[in-house]
């Protein structure tokens, strides 16, 4: 009976430490993968010009590492290269690139540039739900709640189950009622 309580506490501590160890290991694995991808793209870009899809992937890695200036450069390069290819399915990729560049500028705190890129993505694909959500978020940031709400309404007409649009629209409605 006397040994049962310490054994119980040690068991709980061991389980907690095992879970913590697993979480740290997963985080380290993610960091090492990101670093190896970044090193791969840096080495490859120094030796030769990256393909458009490689520039796009490199820009995504740079965003994950919060290297926004490098991500903007690579994103612009990928955009230029995709425009030069003249492939029919390019419009979807170009809209994705515009949206990604908008996201990068938004994360860097430059909302006016971000807004322009989101609008360009929507000119190419007016039903691009992610770009609509992102543009609505910018309108929320600048306190233009009517435009934000109308964009969220458009998102919900395209995708009724969009959690982001539902949540943000409810938030705007609560904000208006205060």
From Swiss-Prot:
Annotated TM spans: none
Cite the SMART domains for this sequence.
Answer: TPR (SM00028)
Record's GO cellular component terms: chloroplast
Q: Does the keyword section mention Plastid?
A: yes
- Keyword annotations from UniProtKB, A to Z: Chloroplast, Plastid, Repeat, TPR repeat
Q: Which InterPro entries match?
A: TPR-like_helical_dom_sf (IPR011990), TPR_rpt (IPR019734)
Q: Where are the TPR repeats?
A: 52-89, 95-128, 129-162
Q: Which SUPFAM superfamilies match?
A: TPR-like
Tell me the leader sequence span. Answer: none
User: Which compartment or compartments is the protein found in?
Assistant: Plastid, Chloroplast
**Principal place where this protein is found?**
plastid
Q: Looking at the record's lineage, which domain of life comes first?
A: Eukaryota
Q: Which family does it belong to?
A: Belongs to the ycf37 family.
State what protein this is by name. Answer: Uncharacterized protein ycf37
Source organism per entry reads Pyropia yezoensis
Gene that produces this protein: ycf37
């Amino acid at each position: 009976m006397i040994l049962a309580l310490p054994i119980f506490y040690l068991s709980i501590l061991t389980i907690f430490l095992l879970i913590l160890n697993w979480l740290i290991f997963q985080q380290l694995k993610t960091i090492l993968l990101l670093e190896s991808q970044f090193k791969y793209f840096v080495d490859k870009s120094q030796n030769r010009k990256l393909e458009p899809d490689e520039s796009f992937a490199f820009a995504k890695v740079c965003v994950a590492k919060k290297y926004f200036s490098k991500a903007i450069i690579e994103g612009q390069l990928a955009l230029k290269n995709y425009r030069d290819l003249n492939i029919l399915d390019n419009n979807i990729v170009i809209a994705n690139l515009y949206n990604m560049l908008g996201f990068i500028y938004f994360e860097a705190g430059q909302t006016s540039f971000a807004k322009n890129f989101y609008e360009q993505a929507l000119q190419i694909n007016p039903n691009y739900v992610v770009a609509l959500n992102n543009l609505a978020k910018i309108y929320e940031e600048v306190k233009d709640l009517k435009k934000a709400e109308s964009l969220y309404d458009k998102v919900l007409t395209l995708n009724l189950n969009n959690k982001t649009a539902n949540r943000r629209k409810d938030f705007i409605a609560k904000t208006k009622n205060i």
